[in-house]
Amino acid sequence: MSMVYANIFLAFIMSLMGLLMYRSHLMSSLLCLEGMMLSLFVMMTVTILNNHFTLASMTPIILLVFAACEAALGLSLLVMVSNTYGTDYVQNLNLLPC
């Protein structure tokens, strides 16, 4: 494993650990999820470029589309929770009416 792959994998693990440790606030959870998606995007792009696998060159762009959708939904949920309850605690998500 080259140093580039190790650093990208370390960034993913650090984002995952941040998600597991700092999950009390919704904003910190969303930031950690974005870090995970960014490291996955970079890993996929570097792998495709190193292997000259041009058939899968659309895959990182599709991942970015899903990351943008995830960010938009997460921010809309954050705005709804903070307007309703005044805080961005994840425990307030259990109180939302369906």
Curated annotation (Swiss-Prot):
It is an enzyme of class 7 (translocase). One of its GO terms (molecular function) is NADH dehydrogenase (ubiquinone) activity. The keyword Membrane applies. It catalyses: a ubiquinone + NADH + 5 H(+)(in) = a ubiquinol + NAD(+) + 4 H(+)(out). Its EC number is 7.1.1.2. Its main location: mitochondrion. It is a multi-pass membrane protein. One of its GO terms (cellular component) is mitochondrial inner membrane. It is found in: Mitochondrion inner membrane. One of its GO terms (biological process) is ATP synthesis coupled electron transport. Keywords: Electron transport, Membrane, Mitochondrion, Mitochondrion inner membrane, NAD, Respiratory chain, Translocase, Transmembrane, Transmembrane helix, Transport, Ubiquinone. The chain crosses the membrane at residues 1-21, 29-49, 61-81. InterPro entries: NADH_UbQ_OxRdtase_chain4L/K, NUOK/Mnh_C1-like. PANTHER family: NADH-UBIQUINONE OXIDOREDUCTASE CHAIN 4L, NADH-UBIQUINONE OXIDOREDUCTASE SUBUNIT ND4L. Core subunit of the mitochondrial membrane respiratory chain NADH dehydrogenase (Complex I) which catalyzes electron transfer from NADH through the respiratory chain, using ubiquinone as an electron acceptor. Part of the enzyme membrane arm which is embedded in the lipid bilayer and involved in proton translocation. Belongs to the complex I subunit 4L family. Core subunit of respiratory chain NADH dehydrogenase (Complex I) which is composed of 45 different subunits. This is NADH-ubiquinone oxidoreductase chain 4L.
